[in-house]
Amino acid sequence: MSLWVDKYRPCSLGRLDYHKEQAAQLRNLVQCGDFPHLLVYGPSGAGKKTRIMCILRELYGVGVEKLRIEHQTITTPSKKKIEISTIASNYHLEVNPSDAGNSDRVVIQEMLKTVAQSQQLETNSQRDFKVVLLTEVDKLTKDAQHALRRTMEKYMSTCRLILCCNSTSKVIPPIRSRCLAVRVPAPSIEDICHVLSTVCKKEGLNLPSQLAHRLAEKSCRNLRKALLMCEACRVQQYPFTADQEIPETDWEVYLRETANAIVSQQTPQRLLEVRGRLYELLTHCIPPEIIMKGLLSELLHNCDGQLKGEVAQMAAYYEHRLQLGSKAIYHLEAFVAKFMALYKKFMEDGLEGMMF
């Protein structure tokens, strides 16, 4: 039994439910013969990976769906061994180099070199190149990005790159200039409602339009999240009702409780408790950027107009530090400590003003 997001994922460009003009342009790009490097970017849950797999299907046929998971060990110049997991077919290789941390440069160089120098096992694909799909390119170190730029030029004849990321702002200009940029915007509320209704019909379920609209809005235009929430609603209660409760993920509830704990008390003991809660989120693989964004959103509900600006500016500062550093907990805890000091001073000043 598979999740709806996997079970009903379109496998060809002609079956995509939205951005159909873009799908037609991508099909023309594949058929023209001169396939370039691609930089596919857009918000989470917009359908980037689905479109990339559809492009690969258009390039090579059904063979790209015969996937295998491979584990490779790469040795760095300092003799350190790095284990990397990849997903591969006979025609392409998918890897997330940022999993290797500061050694991502070595991973990129070795992976691309291996793929570019190996021959395809099936020769009837009529393509003289393989494709390497690199995910989360915006999380690569600058060294790795410069190495990627050099490698792109070196192996252009036997290898094409498809780079996938949420934002191009952290991708260096030399890479952006060597790729055809493909922006995948988030689907509209109407698009998500249509997809939810279609999936529920295929499952033999009756989804009220009001519930579909609420799911689409609560997902923040993230189609993957909307489908997962819809499936959770199905498990929780069926037949659906227009006003039924939409279940939240555990980490979102936990993050809200953490924000409430910060606002309710500003002491060293409470800061220690919050640090433990932040560790709990990080160990469950919640990205630190998401934690920072969620904390800010919840904390702003407890701030007035003047304080909101200061807190948002402070969050931007520590989020920037978070990107530069390697220990997320330091910057998250520093943000919480700074907020506690600011909020406590604000409340004390407010009380003094009321007394006089």
UniProtKB/Swiss-Prot annotation:
The keyword Phosphoprotein applies. The modification Phosphoserine is found at residue 125. Its main location: nucleus. Keywords: Acetylation, DNA replication, DNA-binding, Nucleus, Phosphoprotein. One of its GO terms (cellular component) is nucleus. Pfam families: DNA_pol3_delta2, RCF1-5-like_lid, RFC_C. The modification N6-acetyllysine is found at residue 20. GO terms for molecular function: ATP hydrolysis activity; ATP-dependent activity, acting on DNA; DNA binding; DNA clamp loader activity. It is found in: Nucleus. Belongs to the activator 1 small subunits family. Subunit of the RFC complex, an heteropentameric complex consisting of a large subunit RFC1 and four small subunits RFC2, RFC3, RFC4 and RFC5; the RFC complex interacts with PCNA. Forms an heterotetrameric complex with RFC2, RFC4 and RFC5; this complex has ATPase activity but is not stimulated by PCNA. The heterotetramer of subunits RFC2, RFC3, RFC4 and RFC5 interacts with RAD17. Interacts with CNTD1; this interaction facilitates crossover formation. Subunit of the replication factor C (RFC) complex which acts during elongation of primed DNA templates by DNA polymerases delta and epsilon, and is necessary for ATP-dependent loading of proliferating cell nuclear antigen (PCNA) onto primed DNA. This is Replication factor C subunit 3. The lineage of its organism: Eukaryota, Metazoa, Chordata, Craniata, Vertebrata.
